Amino acid sequence: MLGLDSHADISCAGRDAHILAQTEGRTCTVHLFNDSYDPMTGIKIINVLYKYENTEGGQYILEVNQCLDFTVTIVRSILCTNQVQHTGIIVNDVPKVCNPTSSQDIRVDDGKTVTTLEMNGPIPYLPISKPSINDVEYLPRIKMTADDIDWDPHKIFNQPHLSEYKYLKQDFDISYNIQGVDIYHLPYHHLKYLILLI
């Protein structure tokens, strides 16, 4: 399962991810929501691939670049909504039960490719599986997040003009924020993580 998270600052790769590459020279420190736990250090940043099959039976490879490497420790993967939208992809994640006019999907290439979002309770998601070598080689690929710029949402979205955007420093920290909606649930050892790039 590749769950969408609009409060996440960066995507997280779980066990269904096929690792494409590791981003050299960049690691993260992940702080738990509770100060009594030690932070997780040296978390790698990787580019990964997932296999996705839409409701019509079409199969694709989803390429998610610049995500945290939890491929050994978590089952479900997380897709940062704004990280996807920053590439120009349209994310319509309002559930139809809340708004019957919602398309509840992700639209790529000006709507030419549509991936329908399913719901797991309140969480929109894409059903995924780990791709085989044959899948990786022959299935059409959709690039969900960019690999040509360093992902730093605070610099990107907090700048008054996007032209002022600067590349992310080599090492950065993932920290926590205990104010209300910034709570970010990461299913690792059943603990809650609050992830914010600083």
Regions found by a protein language model. Give the residues of each.
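Beta-strand elements of modular eukaryotic interaction domains
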Residues: 1-2, 96
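Short hydrophobic beta-strand that contains or immediately precedes a catalytic carboxylate
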Residues: 2-7, 11-13
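Catalytic histidine site
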Residues: 8, 17, 83
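Short hydrophobic alpha-helical segments that form membrane-spanning helices or hydrophobic packing faces
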Residues: 12-16, 87
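A glycine- and small-aliphatic-rich helix-loop capping segment at beta-alpha/alpha-beta transitions
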Residues: 15-26
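Aspartic protease core domain of the pepsin/retropepsin superfamily
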Residues: 24-29, 39-198
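Acidic/polar residues in short coil/turn loops that connect beta-strands
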Residues: 32-35
